[in-house]
Amino acid sequence: AERLCGGGAGLAGTGSARATWLVDMPAGDAVRLSCAMMQQSDLGSHHLHFAPKRVTIGVGCARNCPPEELTELVRTALNEAGVCDAAVHSINTISLKADEPAILELAQHLNVPLRLFSAKELEAEASRLATPSDVVFAEVGCHGVSEGAALAQLGSEGKLWLQKRKTANATVALGLTDRPLTDLRGAARGRLSVVGIGPGQ
């Protein structure tokens, strides 16, 4: 409301230098705007937090991995990196896991898109992996699922930020890019629609 009434805003936070779309905003003390990927607390009623979506999450898991195991692993990784949920752009994995309940629940939990990549697309990232695995290659056709998926969503401008972390049944890796991500690479999960059923349909 203060801003709509003509009050100026002050920028702060580690991402403020990249927030070039805000340079024309009138400066002032009516509103404080923090631009950072880290969680902000005790902001007050005149303090807004904007988290640029610069982080991609790559995940992999065993078939029928307990959803809570994957979610807890991802939460631990985000806390380790100091990233708030709002800075997450997407969940990414191999196409073989399109129907994996733990991954579907994770995307719903974080309220971000789930994107799928073929083994060939993930193998294209092999040279950038921190922990390539011949065992994984023998099983699914690429040398890394979580790291490869995080990188595949970023494209060539991004980098691996947090290399693979794992539990007994799940893996996670984080990717990072300098600029907020606005597009989605990879494929969305397919849907089946029944158009008609019965005699004459």
Residue ranges of model-derived segments:
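Residue-level preference for the first positions of well-ordered beta-strands
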Residues: T56, K159, R191-V194
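Long, charge-dense
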Residues: I94, P101-V145
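Predominant activation on well-ordered alpha-helical scaffold segments within soluble catalytic domains
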Residues: T71, R75, L104, V145-A149
